């Protein structure tokens, strides 16, 4: 199964360098967001896609993401960092690992 990345050009270039061959660049313009929505719908329907990585900012602009078991859709931070902040990350780690991370 393939891993696909959707996001801004800098994030996409980084993942291409890491070996992800199917990568789609989008900016945050209205037209580009609509193209991203359509591409996401297309990717979700494909049988050969196992994981879709999408930047948090793009996912936020797209709106509600499809609720599917496969492919797995993971939101990732872009070059500016997470839009959800450290507090959410701490909570996720606390739930997953069972310990609280403090600075």
From Swiss-Prot:
Q: Name one Pfam family in it.
A: ATP-synt_F
Membrane topology of this protein: Peripheral membrane protein
Keyword Manganese (UniProt) = no
Entry protein name? A-type ATP synthase subunit F
Question: Per its UniProt entry, which superkingdom is the organism in?
Answer: Archaea
Q: Which organism is it from?
A: Pyrococcus horikoshii (strain ATCC 700860 / DSM 12428 / JCM 9974 / NBRC 100139 / OT-3)
Q: Which family does it belong to?
A: Belongs to the V-ATPase F subunit family.
Asked if the Swiss-Prot or TrEMBL record annotates the protein with the keyword Membrane, the reply is yes
Broad class of where this protein is predominantly found = membrane
Quaternary data: Has multiple subunits with at least A(3), B(3), C, D, E, F, H, I and proteolipid K(x).
Role played:
Component of the A-type ATP synthase that produces ATP from ADP in the presence of a proton gradient across the membrane.
Question: Which UniProt keywords are given for this protein, alphabetically ordered?
Answer: ATP synthesis, Cell membrane, Hydrogen ion transport, Ion transport, Membrane, Transport
Q: Which GO terms describe its molecular function?
A: ATP binding; proton-transporting ATP synthase activity, rotational mechanism; proton-transporting ATPase activity, rotational mechanism
GO cellular component terms, A-Z: plasma membrane
Which Gene3D superfamilies does this chain map to? Answer: ATPase, V1 complex, subunit F
Q: Which GO terms describe its biological process?
A: proton motive force-driven plasma membrane ATP synthesis
- Annotated compartments: Cell membrane
């Amino acid at each position: 199964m393939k891993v696909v990345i959707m996001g801004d050009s800098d994030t996409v270039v980084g993942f291409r360098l890491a070996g992800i061959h199917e990568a789609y660049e989008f900016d945050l313009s209205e037209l580009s967001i609509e193209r991203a929505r359509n591409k996401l719908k297309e990717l979700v329907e494909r049988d050969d896609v196992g994981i879709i990585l999408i930047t948090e900012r793009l996912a936020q602009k797209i709106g509600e993401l499809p609720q599917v078991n496969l492919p797995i859709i993971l939101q990732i931070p872009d070059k500016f960092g997470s839009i959800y902040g450290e507090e959410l990350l701490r909570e996720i780690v606390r739930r997953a690992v069972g310990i609280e991370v403090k600075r």
